[in-house]
Regions:
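Intrinsically disordered, low-complexity regulatory segments of eukaryotic
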Residues: 2-172
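Positively charged alpha-helical interaction cores common to chromatin-/nucleic-acid-associated regulators
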Residues: 144-209
C-alpha cells in the first residue's frame, strides 16, 4: 500500500515490510500532512484481480482518532482470494530496524504508487516464457502509460529466485519517462541471464528470499 499526493493505491507490502505499527506511523503522518484525504481511505479493488485492500473503516471521523493504533480494523490489511489456486512462495521481506532507517524510510517517506502489470484477460503479471515474444507486452493493460518519471536515471531491482539467495541489481532507465511496456521489457532483459543461467545452489546458504 502506497500513497501519492492525489490518491491511495491498493497493495499490502508496506504492512508486510514494516509491520502494523510502523505502517500506521506512515499513514498517520500522511494524513496529518494533508497528503491523503480520509474519503480516499475506503476499500479499493485492483481491476481484473481478486486483490482488495482495506485501510480505515468508513466511520472514521474527519479528525484523526487517537485509537488509530488500536482499531481492530487495521489500516493496512490485505485480502487476497486465490480463486484459481496456485503456488505460494514464502518471502522474508526487509524491514527498517535502525532509528535512522525508520525516520528516513517511514516517518519522512513519501512512497510512489506501485506499478501493476495486468496482461491479456485480466491476469496479473506477464510470464517469463513469453517475455521476449512482443505479443504479451503489447497486450499489457495501460502499456503506454508512463511509470517512472522521478528524475532518476536508475532503480534498484531486488529479485527472489527460489531457492537461491536474494539478488540485487541496478537497472538503468535513462532520464526520460518510461512506459509500463518498456519497463516490463527492461526488467526481463535484465533478468534473462539470471533465469537461463541460475547460480549453483549452495545448500549451506539455502534460504527463503
Amino acid at each position: 500500500m502506497c500513497f501519492s499526493s492525489d490518491r491511495l493505491a491498493t497493495e499490502g507490502s508496506l504492512s508486510l515490510m514494516w509491520g502494523p505499527r510502523l505502517s500506521e506511523v506512515y499513514i498517520t503522518n500522511s494524513l496529518l500532512k494533508g497528503q491523503v484525504a480520509l474519503d480516499q481511505l475506503q476499500p479499493k479493488e485492483i481491476p481484473g484481480t481478486s486483490i482488495v485492500g482495506y485501510y480505515l473503516p468508513p466511520e472514521v471521523p474527519d479528525s484523526l482518532p487517537s485509537s488509530i493504533a488500536t482499531n481492530p480494523h487495521r489500516p493496512v490489511d490485505l485480502v487476497v482470494d486465490l480463486k484459481e489456486g496456485g503456488p505460494i512462495i514464502p518471502q522474508e521481506i526487509w524491514t527498517p530496524h535502525t532509528s535512522k532507517n525508520q525516520q528516513d524510510l517511514v516517518a519522512d517517506a513519501m512512497l510512489h504508487l506501485p506499478i501493476y502489470f495486468i496482461g491479456d484477460g485480466g491476469k496479473l503479471g506477464v510470464s517469463y516464457a513469453h517475455a521476449f515474444n512482443k505479443a504479451p507486452t503489447r497486450t499489457l493493460d495501460g502499456g503506454e502509460e508512463e511509470t517512472f518519471d522521478f528524475g532518476k536515471s536508475s532503480v534498484e531491482l531486488r529479485v527472489c529466485l527460489w531457492p537461491y539467495k536474494r539478488k540485487e541489481f541496478t537497472m538503468y532507465l535513462g532520464k526520460k519517462s518510461v512506459t509500463r511496456r518498456t519497463l516490463a521489457q527492461k526488467v526481463f532483459a535484465r533478468l534473462k541471464d539470471l533465469f537461463e543461467n541460475p547460480p549453483e545452489l549452495d545448500i549451506m546458504h539455502k534460504k527463503v528470499c
